[in-house]
From Swiss-Prot:
Protein name in UniProt: Uncharacterized HTH-type transcriptional regulator YvkB
UniProt xrefs under PANTHER family: ACREF/ENVCD OPERON REPRESSOR-RELATED (PTHR43479), ACREF_ENVCD OPERON REPRESSOR-RELATED (PTHR43479:SF11)
Alphabetic keyword roster: DNA-binding, Repressor, Transcription, Transcription regulation
SUPFAM superfamilies: Homeodomain-like
Pfam families per UniProt: TetR_N
Length: 189
């Protein structure tokens, strides 16, 4: 990516998170990025083009996550949960934008939910495999995945909006503790 486009996208992200889509103008983005407004129009066509470019920056590779599992339920779920939380953290600005003006940003919301949906399917597939091996209770893999993801999402959203004012447990400890509780709840024995 050209340095000019990176500056424009960085400025757009900062302003969109701070002010929202409607309140942010291309003129403000241009000023913050130290470019002319014409440069924005030439490179991105309009403000919606900027949003689309921001979304295209946030693609992930979930396939390698399962390749790094070991067959140990606790370690694997800890790894999957850590990857999910790291990806959410990586996408937090896009998520903030989608929360500010959800009616305007159906494309953003669709983009934001794409990764978690694919992670849920990955988790369901993993849990089915572990069920077939007799490690966990079978038959409720989708529900188990929903619960596990809700733990991760709940922590992320809480931190996004409230910081550590209520849940002060560090991320690593929260992941370890909640994963241990979850594993205990779904284990076959």
């Amino acid at each position: 990516m050209r340095p000019t486009n990176k500056r424009i996208l960085d400025a757009a992200m900062q302003l969109l998170v701070k002010k929202g889509y409607r309140a942010t103008t291309t003129k403000e983005i241009a000023e913050k990025a130290n470019v002319s407004e014409a440069t924005i129009f030439r490179n991105f066509k309009n403000k919606q083009g900027l949003v689309e470019a921001l979304l295209s920056q946030h693609s992930s590779n979930r396939g390698s996550i399962l390749e790094q599992t070991e067959g140990d339920l606790y370690k694997d779920l800890l790894h999957i949960g850590t990857c999910l939380l790291e990806e959410l953290e990586h996408r937090k600005d896009i998520i903030k934008i989608s929360f500010r003006e959800p009616a305007m940003f159906q494309d953003v919301i669709n983009h934001v939910t794409e990764y978690p949906q694919s992670m849920k399917q990955l988790l369901v597939d993993y849990l089915k495999t572990m069920g077939e091996k007799g490690v966990i209770q079978t038959g409720n893999e989708a529900e188990h995945a929903d619960v596990f993801m809700s733990i991760i999402f709940g922590y992320f959203i809480h931190r996004l909006h409230l910081g550590d004012r209520v849940i002060s447990m560090p991320q690593e400890k929260m992941l370890e503790h909640s994963t241990a509780l979850f594993v205990k709840g779904i284990s076959a024995d």
